[in-house]
């Protein structure tokens, strides 16, 4: 959802979505963005959203109520356009792709334990080349199939191995399944 990019602009805008997205609850995004100064109206907590950020974005110290990378990213992107330093406290760590990408683009984002500290941008973000690898949760089905079939051999290429996204691999390693990785590289998020 582009709310995380748009909310840091001093604009009024509307967001709509396809049928699937329009069924997803938006309250968990509406709550922190409203606390940051956005005026938001919705369809009973669903899309479409009308967001008025024309008065600017205020800093926030937000305690995440649910583990959600989408909520965290909404706050991260919005806080970049804020009037002061913001922080996000994660009860349970979520995937960290947004933080990695934003740091590589020049944003000042720090981590102190479970707290993420976001400094407002002082200049434009740098452009970077972004490579989007395959989703490990989609690969998990094929890995499980290979594990339960004796003498199987499965090779997956270009699959994301971010530590916050490979819980199933960690479980399989504890079960003594033979899983090897090769050609590992770090990308921009």
Q: Where is each model-derived feature located?
A:
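Structural preference for solvent-exposed beta-strand-turn elements
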Residues: 1-189
